[in-house]
Design a protein with these regions (language model features):
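Extracytoplasmic/lumenal domain signature
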Residues: 1-192
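Beta-rich interaction/scaffold domains
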Residues: 192-226
Length: 226
C-alpha cells in the first residue's frame, strides 16, 4: 500500500511498501508545499489526512507563531501530485485534521476539521470534493486593522479556555468533538438543537391518569445549529 508523510522542510511524500515490509524506493513521489501566500518557504508537521485521492495537511506561514503570516490548510491532489489550493488560517495547523463523510452522498463534499496552533486556538472546517481548485465558504477576520479571508471557524475557545492548540480533533459516533489545548482543559463540542417539529402525531393521544406515554407512530424533526 501507499504511505504518506510530511517534513519540516516543507515536502509532502508518498511511498509504497512491499509485501515484505520494505520500502519501494522507486515509488517515492513528493510535492513541494506552499503556504497560503504562495511561498514555498513553509513547513509541515501534519500526519496527512487522506481520502478519495485527496490529502489534507497544515502548512506554516513565514513566521511559525506570527498571526496571518501565510499559515493554512493545504489540499493536495494525489492523482496529479500537485497542490489543489490552500485555505488561509490565523495560526499554523500543526497536527492532523479529522474528516467526515457524513454529508458526502447528499452534497458530494467531505468536511475536514483542523485547529490553529495560535491563541485562542480556533477550530476550523473546510469542505472539499475531487476536482475542486479553490477554497469555498471563506469568512473574514480582522487583526490590527487588516482584514483576512480565512477558513470557516466552527468554534473559538474563550476566556480561560483560549490557548494554543496542538492536538488532533477526535469525534465520536454522535458527532461530539473532543479536544484539549494548552489551557489544560479537555473540552467536548457538540451540536445543540435549535428547533423541534412534530410532523406526525402518535397513534395514541388520549391518556388516563397514571398511563405512560406511548410514542408509537410519532415523528419528530430536530434541527441542529450546525
Amino acid at each position: 500500500g501507499d504511505y504518506y508523510f510530511t517534513s519540516k522542510s516543507g515536502y509532502f511524500y508518498r511511498i509504497s511498501v512491499n509485501a515484505d515490509g520494505t520500502f519501494d524506493k522507486d515509488s517515492l513521489r513528493w510535492i513541494k508545499l506552499e503556504n497560503s501566500k504562495g511561498s514555498d518557504l513553509t513547513m509541515s508537521t501534519s500526519t496527512p489526512t487522506v481520502y478519495n485521492g485527496r490529502a489534507y495537511v497544515g502548512v506554516s506561514g513565514s513566521e511559525q507563531f506570527g498571526a496571518y503570516s501565510g499559515h493554512g490548510i493545504a489540499v493536495l491532489d494525489l492523482k496529479t501530485m500537485s497542490i489543489a489550493y490552500v485555505v488561509p488560517t490565523q495560526g499554523y495547523p500543526q497536527t492532523s485534521g479529522v474528516l467526515t463523510r457524513a454529508y458526502e452522498k447528499e452534497t458530494g463534499k467531505v468536511y475536514v476539521y483542523f485547529f490553529d496552533n495560535y491563541t485562542p486556538g480556533k477550530l476550523r472546517v473546510i469542505s472539499d470534493e475531487p476536482g475542486q481548485t479553490e477554497a469555498t465558504d471563506l469568512e473574514q477576520e480582522t487583526d490590527k486593522g487588516n482584514t483576512y479571508d480565512v477558513g470557516t471557524v466552527l468554534f473559538t475557545p474563550s476566556d480561560a479556555q483560549a490557548q494554543y492548540a496542538l492536538c488532533n480533533p477526535i469525534v465520536d459516533e454522535y458527532g461530539t468533538l473532543y479536544f484539549r489545548n494548552d489551557s489544560n482543559h479537555m473540552m467536548a463540542l457538540g451540536a445543540t438543537i435549535s428547533k423541534l417539529e412534530v410532523t406526525k402525531q402518535p397513534k395514541k393521544t388520549s391518556y388516563k391518569e397514571g398511563e405512560k406515554f406511548d410514542p408509537s407512530g410519532m415523528q419528530v424533526i430536530a434541527t441542529y445549529t450546525n
